[in-house]
Amino acid sequence: MVKLAFGSFRDSLSAASLKAYVAEFIATLLFVFAGVGSAIAYSQLTKGGALDPAGLVAIAIAHAFALFVGVSMAANISGGHLNPAVTFGLAVGGHITILTGILYWVAQLLGASVACFLLQYVTHGQAIPTHGVSGISEIEGVVMEIVITFALVYTVYATAADPKKGSLGTIAPMAIGFIVGANILAAGPFSGGSMNPARSFGPAVAAGNFAGNWVYWVGPLVGGGLAGLVYGDVFIASYQPVGQQEYP
């Protein structure tokens, strides 16, 4: 059962909420800077060569490490979402209101866009790589993104949002980073392995190229929403009302 709640402007504009938006902006900026930066660095080192297995592994590791750190640095302030799909998945489960979630989205999208413009500047105008499907159709890309984003948001629920997580919560940032790295290894050659509308939106803004960008909104949001619905209804709802939970 979907537990979406609109929320109030008073709560969404409180001092604590404003700090959360700043934390999301900074953490998303740093994550995207490292993630997209790793792809630019690979292109520079190979003189624009095609992505090979070593490059895919390097980029996956960079994203995993950067997300691990980004979630860790923002977790105590905003919950460490860094991703509109994670925010949406948590909203579906009743962990964040729609209004606050929208403002999280704004912070995340701004952070990702600023990161890519910074990369464009500090690399002396290097092309910003954008996500796009390769060897598959856009619909197949959407399905791929649904599956891998479901895995990501399900991991967020299991390690961070579940009230019975106990000491497992201490490894949540690491687990979240690991699943993103693994999914990039699996989906990178096909859909790009985004799982994150902000991660795809920032490069599209900086490059001025939104071709196929809808894939990285529809897929991740559907996957994140399904994960929130499944984990929230099947597991969390069976032992504790959502209103009593602490995350984010």
Curated annotation (Swiss-Prot):
GO terms for cellular component: membrane; plant-type vacuole membrane; plasma membrane; protein storage vacuole membrane. InterPro entries: Aquaporin-like, Aquaporin_transptr, MIP, MIP_CS. GO terms for molecular function: water channel activity. It is a multi-pass membrane protein. Induction: By salt and osmotic stress. Expressed in roots with a circadian rhythm showing an increase at the end of the night period, a peak during the first part of the light period and then a decrease. NCBIfam families: MIP. PANTHER family: AQUAPORIN TIP2-3, AQUAPORIN-8. This is Aquaporin TIP2-3. It comes from Zea mays (Maize).
